[in-house]
UniProtKB/Swiss-Prot annotation:
PROSITE patterns associated with the record: PANNEXIN (PS51013)
Gene that this polypeptide is encoded by: inx-14
Protein name: Innexin-14
Mode of membrane association: Multi-pass membrane protein
Pfam family, one: Innexin
Highest taxon in the source lineage: Eukaryota
């Protein structure tokens, strides 16, 4: 299968492997990838293995299978045209700019292109995660498996491992700020900035996709979906004198009232003009009446996709605004983390410095990147598993802070030569000589 090809498989599945670092609104875009993939298979199977077009041919052409197959394939890939309806009668038109219908053969490829477009923000976010100094995806994944062990000792061992890993990164975060770029990549706000850019990328992409659908169907207004929905709900009634029409007038009325061509962008009954060489020097033009059964499917798919993209745009904007307000609100972050460490506080004896430890834990120890990580853990693993890990992390922080209170931002030691090495002083304890 294509997934087993090393380069292609990694290129496609990489966003799904990093799918743990998303919130609910981002996973809607991942759902859209699956939805569009299903549309690719559905329309592609109908077009390449089904019966995408049927034409009513003259007897001399229909009797010869080679000619019949040739004409059907020609009309499918070269394109068709709409009927010209005027003055209550219909007649064959021609391949004019307004009448031509030639998008339907590209529908599976268009959906495949959209799949790549929706995967692009996930690919970018998966790459940007490598720029973050802490492996958030590993922490979220490992935290979700802490209760998979059968014994309490094994579970506690897993919790201690992940807590020690997180503690080392948060405690010594600034030890790596030695270069110009490191002041950016090791800044606590850097992961939040990258994730905010990713969310803006999601919004930009879905807005572009709405416009691409309109361009692909050659519609002038982005409200075409509402027009089509209105025709479904309130179809145009037939004229009272329909029963007295001639056959040609009835056929024209059917074309205009929507029984076969409910909406002009998805015509079912079309015409096709083809040329056959019936002798060495004799080329004869023919016109055939055709139906496009796949447009029945395309009509439902595109109207559903149109409204889903509009809903997705609205939800993405709401989710991004909520995310920015949430990550910027000190009060909300404090309340969220206090709930996670509440159980740990109840089990410990009263400490007069606990309020200072709690505040420093949120704003000087976790900072913006730690808070972002906790949001990912809660969205993926739930409250209980996150509570167990963060509660243990807070205990470890307090055990260190109780002996070595964290008061100020770390500074480099002023006399590294006297100490035989240079290190970052975090305010926990004075560095000892070797």
């Amino acid at each position: 299968m294509i997934w087993e090809i090393p380069i292609i498989g990694d290129f496609i599945t990489k966003p799904f492997k990093a799918a743990k670092l998303y919130e609910f609104y981002d996973r809607l875009h991942l759902f859209t990838v699956y939805l569009l993939g299903f549309f690719v298979l559905l329309t592609g199977a109908k077009q390449h293995f089904g019966n995408p077009i049927d034409c009513m041919l003259p007897k001399q052409h229909d009797d010869l299978k080679s000619w019949r197959d040739y004409i059907h394939n020609f009309c499918l890939f070269y394109g068709t045209f709409r009927y010209d309806v005027s003055n209550g009668t219909s007649e064959f038109g021609s391949y004019t700019e307004d009448a031509s219908v030639n998008y339907y053969q590209w529908v599976p490829f268009f959906f495949a292109f959209q799949v790549c477009c929706f995967l692009l923000p996930f690919w970018c976010w998966a790459y940007m995660q490598k720029l973050i100094y802490i492996d958030m995806a590993f922490i979220v994944d490992y935290s979700g498996k802490i209760n998979s062990e059968k014994t309490f000792e094994k579970t506690k061992e897993k919790v201690d491992r992940i807590v020690n890993y997180m503690h080392d990164h948060f405690k010594f975060r600034r030890a790596h700020k030695m270069g110009y770029l490191s002041w950016i990549t090791f800044n606590s706000a850097f992961p939040s900035v990258l994730y905010s850019l990713t969310k803006l990328f999601f919004i930009t992409n879905v807005i572009i996709q709405v416009n691409l659908v309109c361009k692909f169907l050659d519609v002038d207004s982005w409200t075409w979906g509402f027009d089509l929905l209105g025709k479904f709900i309130h179809p145009t009634p037939r004229a009272p004198e329909f029963s007295s029409f001639s056959d040609k007038q009835r056929f024209a009325a059917i074309l205009t009232d929507g029984s076969y061509n409910r909406f002009q962008y998805f015509p079912i009954l079309v015409g096709c003009e083809y040329q056959l060489q019936e002798s060495v020097s004799n080329f004869v033009n023919h016109k055939a009446q055709c139906i496009i059964p796949m447009n029945v499917i395309n009509e439902k798919i595109f109207i559903g996709l149109y409204f889903w993209l509009l809903v997705l745009t609205a939800l993405s904007v709401i989710g991004t605004v909520k995310w920015i307000l949430r990550i910027k609100s000190k009060k909300l972050n404090e309340v969220m983390i206090y709930k996670l460490i509440k159980k740990s506080l109840e089990r410990e004896p009263f400490d007069s410095n606990i309020h200072d430890h709690r505040y420093n834990f949120v704003h000087k120890y976790l900072c913006a990147d730690g808070i972002l990580l906790i949001y990912f853990m809660m969205d993926t693993n739930g409250f209980l598993k996150t509570e167990e890990v963060i509660g243990a992390l807070f205990k470890k922080y307090c055990s260190d802070a109780g002996l070595e209170p964290l008061q100020t931002a770390p500074t480099l030691t002023s006399s590294p030569r006297d100490l035989a090495y240079s290190e970052t002083n975090y305010g926990f304890a004075a560095p000892q000589k070797i």
